[in-house]
Design a protein with these regions (language model features):
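Structural beta-sheet core signal
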Residues: 14-16, 60, 113, 138-141
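Hydrophobic packing residues within well-ordered alpha-helices of enzyme cores
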Residues: 25, 70-71, 129, 149, ...
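Residue-level signal for inorganic ion chemistry
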Residues: 16, 42, 99, 114-115, ...
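Short, conserved active-site loop motifs that form the nucleotide-linked donor/cofactor pocket
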Residues: 12, 82-83, 170
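SAM-dependent methyltransferases
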Residues: 2-13, 19, 51, 108, ...
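Short phosphate-binding loop-to-helix
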Residues: 75-109
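N-terminal glycine-rich phosphate-binding loop and ensuing alpha1 helix
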Residues: 9-68
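Conserved core of the sugar-phosphate nucleotidyltransferase
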Residues: 120-215, 245-247
């Protein structure tokens, strides 16, 4: 008798590492908790993923002292049924690893990792990233470079230019960064075993030998790291609310 197979619906999970202290903002609290148009930056980001029907579950990794605070905010903004809070680690890679361990995922499921402080990500870009992961196994959102890119050498007297990198060979990595669960899990396991710490998830996956596709990004999808970034995000929100700008 031939074996019976059951079709399984692919799941999509989002992970938002939010355990950073945000020292460059020089504020009294981590930047993900700062208000953007009266709403915490983290909540803006969580709402964006919650609005995408294909996203099965959302996991946010925060420092242990912030867990109750984040759970209260999630409940206040009506996201408790979509978002789960896990304890983050000492760095981004550890926080993502903790969230990966909590996912009820299988190898072919999709995992999107997004900077908690990119609050203006739009649903269309999230959907395109999911599509790219289904096709390629791994994909990042990337913004084409418009400035001339120089490779430099650091010396005791400052930086010296050693070459010019053609712009067509460069993209500025944004998030979300998406992967098949199995690909990301194996790459993280290898990185942990080797003591490798990447600056983003794609660098860990690249190191494991996996190709990573690029989905077009947007300047609106900015990462809030400095005080001026918060002002720019507020400007973008105002422009979009008035119909003067789109993603």
């Amino acid at each position: 008798m031939a074996p019976m197979y059951t079709s399984r619906v692919m799941q999509v999970f989002a992970i938002l590492p939010a355990a950073g202290l945000g020292t460059r903002m020089a504020g009294a609290q981590p930047k993900q908790f700062l208000a953007l148009n009266g709403i915490p930056i983290l909540i803006h980001s969580l709402r964006a993923f919650s609005s995408v029907e294909r996203v099965t579950g959302i996991y946010v990794a925060v420092r242990k002292p912030e867990i109750e605070r984040v759970e209260a905010q999630i409940a206040e903004y009506g996201l408790a049924d979509r978002v789960k809070v896990v304890e983050g680690g000492d760095n981004r890679q550890e926080s993502v690893s903790h969230a990966l361990a909590a996912l009820p995922a299988e190898n072919d499921d999709v995992v999107l990792v997004h900077d908690a402080v990119r609050p203006l990500i739009d649903a269309a870009t999230i959907d395109r990233t999911i599509d790219a992961v289904q096709q390629h196994g791994a994909a990042i959102v990337g913004l084409p470079a418009v400035d001339t890119i120089k490779q430099v050498e650091r010396t005791a007297h400052g930086a010296l230019v050693i070459s010019t990198i053609p712009r067509e060979f460069v993209v500025l990595a944004q998030t979300p960064q998406g992967f098949r669960f199995g690909i990301l899990q194996r790459a993280f396991a290898e990185a942990t075993a080797d003591g490798f710490l990447g600056t983003d998830e794609a660098s860990v996956v690249e190191r494991a030998g996996n190709p990573v596709a690029v989905v077009p990004g947007s300047q609106v999808n900015l990462k809030i790291t400095k005080p001026g970034d918060l002002e720019l995000a507020e400007f973008y929100l105002h422009q979009m609310a008035n119909g003067q700008m789109t993603h």
